[in-house]
Amino acid sequence: MLQNIRIVLVETSHTGNMGSVARAMKTMGLTNLWLVNPLVKPDSQAIALAAGASDVIGNAHIVDTLDEALAGCSLVVGTSARSRTLPWPMLDPRECGLKSVAEAANTPVALVFGRERVGLTNEELQKCHYHVAIAANPEYSSLNLAMAVQVIAYEVRMAWLATQENGEQVEHEETPYPLVDDLERFYGHLEQTLLATGFIRENHPGQVMNKLRRLFTRARPESQELNILRGILASIEQQNKGNKA
């Protein structure tokens, strides 16, 4: 089940951080590392700092875009500070661990970490169902990348161990929630429909789509509910075409 949990690093700029992250992951039983458009490729320094976790580096998935790293996932959590222009559903690390383990029993989960200096962009954070913030010392809250991964990975392991110690049988069943790919298609469909009806203007959607993303992220519709919403959009499109005919 832990293999279903992806640690996703976005545009990492130091190979040493890749190695340190791999070490942090493996100590907690995580091995599924994804590197999104890394500014440098893993090298001997990454292997050295991995300190026995070189297999995690060697098996890392290297992709060009965040969408590729999130494909097939039903839950995405991004690391972020709380002060954002557009508030988002928040988790603390413990809640993140519990949710990740519960969902990873059936489908892949992505835990996304941003660039060393600037973290994740707002656009990247909007692709996440939740944001997770580590309650560090407010007078000195500077965690490096590997430290942040270690904190989250520890909580994932504690949540997983609890299921083992309690003798809980993790049920493998079809997840009720849509994959990230399906959600992105829905958002594209929604934007096209709103453009066609004149509700938003092309190239000037403003904050409307961002707020709608937040609304549906907060509601987190199940797959069948998302299909209903897609059906409603298709009906509106059909009606709109009929009115223009």
UniProtKB/Swiss-Prot annotation:
GO MF terms, alphabetically ordered: RNA binding; tRNA (cytidine(32)/uridine(32)-2'-O)-methyltransferase activity
Residue sites binding S-adenosyl-L-methionine per the record: 79-81, 114, 134, 141-143
Enzyme class: transferase
Record keywords, A-Z: Cytoplasm, Methyltransferase, S-adenosyl-L-methionine, Transferase, tRNA processing
Any one GO BP annotation for this protein: tRNA nucleoside ribose methylation
A GO CC term assigned to this protein in UniProt: cytosol
Pfam families for this protein: SpoU_methylase (PF00588)
UniProt feature coiled coil, ranges: none
Assigned EC number: 2.1.1.200
UniProt-annotated location(s): Cytoplasm
Record InterPro entries: Alpha/beta_knot_MTases, RNA_MeTrfase_TrmJ/LasT, SpoU_MeTrfase, tRNA_m1G_MTases_N
Family: Belongs to the class IV-like SAM-binding methyltransferase superfamily. RNA methyltransferase TrmH family.
Protein role: Catalyzes the formation of 2'O-methylated cytidine (Cm32) or 2'O-methylated uridine (Um32) at position 32 in tRNA.
Name of the protein described by the UniProt record: tRNA (cytidine/uridine-2'-O-)-methyltransferase TrmJ
Gene name in the database record: trmJ
